[in-house]
Amino acid sequence: MKLYLIRHGESEANSTASHAGWAQVSLTGKGEGEARAVGECLRREDLTFDRIYTSDLRRAMQTHALALPDTTARTTPHIRVVNVGTLAGRRVADCIDEMGEPYLAAKGRFDFRTWGGENYEMFCTRILQFVRQIEQEDGETIAAFCHGGVIHAVLDMLFSGTLNDGKPVPTEIGIDKPSFACPNCGVFVFEFSKGLWKLRAWNMFDA
């Protein structure tokens, strides 16, 4: 089974360097264009999906609707971006100015509990629930419209062995981990075969 993780297009929060979190922000005009473009790329590859999921946050649902307009997706909260609590909607630069080092340290640890959000363990736990769910379902090709943080979390769990019961499985595409940028509307392909996950393509349409 192949899992295509597709990041949403540029959102209003992306365009202002703000925390989005679970706020229902929309795509920008640029983001809408990115969504249509990735749909064209998928069609050029003759890719069809047995099942499609999307985060239940607006920017991911909009991306699905624009990229694959003649398809239906199941919404799920399990692949939402990390919950940043009351930081949602606030510009990162303003948070730095106001809170300084304590904020930067928490952000670096991916720990937003101070503001009523999640930490990294909580975030990964619900994403892993989604992964374990799709392992049990029928279908050879699955798409999930989600968020950059979700995609990086899946990658981290692959490198750490969490996805594979403690067995790290190296990437087979010749890219070092620090090189893994995750642009808006990037497409990232993971494969589950014989009980193990592998990374098959990172940002597959990158020029």
At which residue positions do the language-model features occur?
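Short glycine/proline- and acidic residue-enriched helix-loop micro-motifs
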Residues: 101-122
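Generic beta-sheet signal
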Residues: 3, 140-148
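Acidic, low-complexity terminal tails and accessory targeting/binding regions
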Residues: 76, 82-94, 156-207
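Phosphate-coordination/substrate-recognition cap region in phosphate-metabolizing enzymes
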Residues: 37-104
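Active-site catalytic microenvironments for nucleophilic, acid-base chemistry
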Residues: 41, 66, 70, 133, ...
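Glycine-rich phosphate-binding loop signature in dinucleotide/nucleotide-binding domains
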Residues: 45-48, 134-140
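Short active-site segment of divalent metal-dependent hydrolases/proteases
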Residues: 11, 150-151
